[in-house]
């Protein structure tokens, strides 16, 4: 597996990441954990150490599958990237970010997230709620 340094973080991530948006799901539109967890673990066993998910993937159950899959591994060597929706002013409020972060951490059953990304960020929301002093990320 080829690994590259992720930006200025110093973390070496696999050039091939595992996107967890299309994991097997049941008729209830929830992740099929019995199928998904072994698939994720097989990817990790083959050298993939970067897993991408998001708050809304498969009705939020993608993060649960990722969390269960990574439990069997050294967490310092498997990197999880997830996304929080911030497409409107309501989503960009600090208390909403905190609420969603708490949900994500619970779903992943992890004390931390390696990489968090803005999902659906508009320029209006960025300038109004994120880039200003004392903003959501301040």
Task: Please provide the spans of the model-predicted regions.
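Non-cysteine beta-strand/loop elements that form the S-adenosyl-L-methionine
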Residues: 15, 19, 81, 110, ...
């Amino acid at each position: 597996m080829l690994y590259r340094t992720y930006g200025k973080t110093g973390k070496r991530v696999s050039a091939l990441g595992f996107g967890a948006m299309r994991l097997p799901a049941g008729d209830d539109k929830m992740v099929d954990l019995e199928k998904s967890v072994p698939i994720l673990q097989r990817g990790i066993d083959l050298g993939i150490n970067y897993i991408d998910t998001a708050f809304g993937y498969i009705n939020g159950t993608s993060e649960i599958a990722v969390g269960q899959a990574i439990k069997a591994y050294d967490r310092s060597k498997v990197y999880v990237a997830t996304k929080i929706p911030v497409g409107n002013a309501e989503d960009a409020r600090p208390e909403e970010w905190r609420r969603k972060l708490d949900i994500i951490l619970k779903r992943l059953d992890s004390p931390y997230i390696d990489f968090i990304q803005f999902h659906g960020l508009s320029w209006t929301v960025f300038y109004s709620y994120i880039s200003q002093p004392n903003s959501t990320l301040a």
